[in-house]
């Protein structure tokens, strides 16, 4: 290589380094901007945590102190009367928790399996009836049968009355979850991998279980979290389908307890032995929120990274 060529090569190398430095400088933000964004995130976190803190503190405050002093950052008068009233009959709450946990776990697994299989079929370009089943699924996002037909279908046709199945089976499938999983299959699983597996003699089930599922684990976690939150917070199915207290879930049990408490407060004048001041009303609502949201908050950190990625992929490419 001549001296002229060496100089030209060094000049081009320096130009590339300078261009790289300028590119990095454009992508980096200043300390002042970084500090500003950190302050915004801290304020946002406070806005999220503050209501939860108020709920917890209010639930362990006496009804009289809460009525007199209002909401405080620390209980003015410590009391667990709201939780005592909520768990006054332990067997009812234990049954409600048991039914809710069983329904949530079983329904989540069922949702992941059904949505995963259905979405995988829709993601395959060689599936003959892909358009029909895509329309069949997404049609339910636009039109619903109504409450009367829903009531008759679940109670009479499917025979779900007074069963644990009523708490999760009607919620085990969603067209929105199908969109998320289909997007994951199409974006996270290259077609070349599936073709290579077929060339090596792998069948559809082996390809799905050993190759596709590990690559789409974020999608399964997202669908599972959506399903678990929906089943845990649902009380409409229990209200419409179940009549026996043995099959009530946590949300409907607390809903009934709140109605009973409201009835006592409104009709206290007719009941000489009832002291309205000792009945928790606002504190009971706060205790209900703590009892119902607590397990979900504790479980969410384990699924957070999957959940965030699932929403991102589903939103961008769905």
Question: Model-found features: residue ranges?
Answer:
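A hydrophobic, multi-pass inner-membrane permease signature
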Residues: 2-318
